From Swiss-Prot:
One of its GO terms (molecular function) is 3-isopropylmalate dehydratase activity. Belongs to the LeuD family. LeuD type 2 subfamily. It catalyses: (2R,3S)-3-isopropylmalate = (2S)-2-isopropylmalate. Its EC number is 4.2.1.33. It is an enzyme of class 4 (lyase). This is 3-isopropylmalate dehydratase small subunit 1. InterPro entries: Aconitase/3IPM_dehydase_swvl, AconitaseA/IPMdHydase_ssu_swvl, IPMI_Swivel, LeuD, LeuD_type2/HacB/DmdB. Catalyzes the isomerization between 2-isopropylmalate and 3-isopropylmalate, via the formation of 2-isopropylmaleate. The gene is leuD1. It comes from Thermotoga maritima (strain ATCC 43589 / DSM 3109 / JCM 10099 / NBRC 100826 / MSB8).
C-alpha cells in the first residue's frame, strides 16, 4: 500500500523537464541531480517534495530521450509513485526498472494538488482520502510487482538470478 500527498503536473512532462539538460554534467551524481528534479515544470518541487509524496500528471509523462536517470532521480527525491493519464513507454519501463511504481488512470483531472492518496497496486485501487472518491486501474502485472518489491530490476536479479516468470 502506498500513501502520500499529491504534486500535480500537466500533460507532456518530458525527460528534459524531469532532468534539465543544463545539469547533464551531474548525471553521474544522481543525489545532486535529484536536487533539480522537475524544476523546469515546478520551480521549487525538489526543495518541497517529501518522502512518500505522489506525482499526478496528465498525458504522455516522461516523453523525450531515454534517460534512465530521469525516473531514478524522481525516486531519489522521495516520490513513492507516479499516476498519469499515460506514460511514454520507455519512461514507464525505466521507472519499473528502478523500482518506481507507475499507474495509468484516466481520471487524474479529478485529483488536486495536495490531496492525500492511498494506492493498492496489487488490486488496482486508488483512494483519494481527501475527497473520499475511489478509482480503479488495471493492476500492475505480478511479474512487474515482483520487480517493484525488490526495489528495481537490478536488485531483483541480484536476489533471484533471473527475470521473473511471466
Amino acid at each position: 500500500m502506498i500513501r502520500g500527498r499529491v504534486w500535480k503536473f500537466g500533460d507532456n512532462i518530458s525527460t528534459d523537464h524531469i532532468a534539465p539538460g543544463r545539469y547533464f554534467h551531474l548525471r553521474n551524481n544522481l543525489e545532486e541531480l535529484a536536487k533539480h528534479v522537475l524544476e523546469d515544470a515546478m520551480e521549487d518541487f525538489a526543495k518541497k517534495v517529501q518522502k512518500g509524496d505522489i506525482i499526478v500528471a496528465g498525458k504522455n509523462f516522461g516523453l523525450g530521450s531515454s534517460r534512465e536517470h530521469a525516473a531514478r532521480i524522481i525516486k531519489i527525491a522521495g516520490v513513492s509513485c507516479i499516476v498519469a493519464k499515460s506514460f511514454a513507454r520507455i519512461f514507464y519501463r525505466n521507472a519499473i526498472n528502478v523500482g518506481l511504481p507507475v499507474i495509468e488512470l484516466k481520471e487524474v483531472d479529478e485529483i488536486n494538488q495536495g490531496d492525500e492518496l492511498e494506492i493498492d497496486l496489487e488490486n488496482g485501487v486508488l483512494k483519494n482520502l481527501t475527497t473520499g472518491k475511489e478509482y480503479r486501474f488495471t493492476p500492475i502485472p505480478k511479474f512487474l510487482l515482483e520487480i517493484l518489491k525488490e526495489d528495481g530490476i537490478v536488485n531483483y536479479l541480484k536476489k533471484h538470478g533471473s527475470f521473473p516468470k511471466v
